[in-house]
Amino acid sequence: MTRSLFKGNFWSADILSTIGYDNIIQHLNNGRKNCKEFEDFLKERAAIEERYGKDLLNLSRKKPCGQSEINTLKRALEVFKQQVDNVAQCHIQLAQSLREEARKMEEFREKQKLQRKKTELIMDAIHKQKSLQFKKTMDAKKNYEQKCRDKDEAEQAVSRSANLVNPKQQEKLFVKLATSKTAVEDSDKAYMLHIGTLDKVREEWQSEHIKACEAFEAQECERINFFRNALWLHVNQLSQQCVTSDEMYEQVRKSLEMCSIQRDIEYFVNQRKTGQIPPAPIMYENFYSSQKNAVPAGKATGPNLARRGPLPIPKSSPDDPNYSLVDDYSLLYQ
């Protein structure tokens, strides 16, 4: 299969036509526009990643999430909050990487723009030169053709005046014929000179057109390769972000595997237990039964109190100087 090349497929039979060159330039402009669109896409994606990372960071650091949990589940939640924080930081770092890739794309576009500008200036100049020389050549051709017609008319006039008796008129016709022949020769030389110049300009234009096609084709190959690699790198970055996030979430899963329902229950019981004996039942008390069983004031009352016997009377011991009888007690000081 023959390789399709720019230099072999963008010509026109019309010497003044630039349709082939214009099609190439339009394609290159579209390619540059596509690179700019991808560059803008990267910038927008970077803004989204940064905004998401910051929002996730604020959520992780400011929003309570099981803050009153205890023991093993508490530790798992701490790992979870930390890994969410790490994931948020990864998204912010991804945003920075995307902006860096967008900057590289912008630099690449500007580099190709400058390279193209040099070639375009040369081609614009040669196109103008070709058009101007073609116009001069066509004007010379018209002048040459007119001089030829003038000479033919002069020859016909001389032929018609062969029978004229007036020699002065014949002489004028011969002078006009000679002048027209000279004019034809001069215009023919000028026309041929312009044709030669136009051919040189045409050859120069063809040479520059081939160079431009080769330069533009190489530039387009470079652009496609750069764009392809940039897109490949972009999806690799997104895939790596997913892998990194999954690795961080795996740490959360591992911490959840260490959770023990039994230990958390026992921990709570040991930390907050209040006792092991429940309250006794509340018994029914009949109001009227309580009145019948009431005792005079000053005497102990209470449910199921055992009755006591009479208090013992102390024996008198007059011989004991520290012992006093009740009869000897008086409130009056004597």
Curated annotation (Swiss-Prot):
Maturation and modification: Phosphorylated on tyrosine.
Gene3D superfamilies named in the record: Arfaptin homology (AH) domain/BAR domain
Annotated positions of the Phosphotyrosine modification: Y323, Y329
Compartment(s) where it occurs, according to its Swiss-Prot or TrEMBL record: Cytoplasm; Membrane
Taxonomic lineage of the native organism: Eukaryota, Metazoa, Chordata, Craniata, Vertebrata
Primary localization class, coarse: cytoplasm
Protein name as it appears in the record: Proline-serine-threonine phosphatase-interacting protein 2
Coiled coil segments of this chain: 66-166
Keywords: Coiled coil, Cytoplasm, Membrane, Phosphoprotein
Topology in the lipid bilayer: Peripheral membrane protein
Pfam family, one: FCH
GO cellular component, one term: membrane
InterPro entries cross-referenced by the UniProt entry: AH/BAR_dom_sf, F_BAR, FCH_dom, PSTPIP2_F-BAR
Keyword Secreted: no
Domain F-BAR: from-to ranges: 4-264
Role description: Binds to F-actin. May be involved in regulation of the actin cytoskeleton.
PROSITE patterns given in the database record: F_BAR
Superkingdom: Eukaryota
Region span, Disordered: 295-322
The keyword Phosphoprotein is annotated on this UniProt entry: yes
Gene responsible for this protein: PSTPIP2
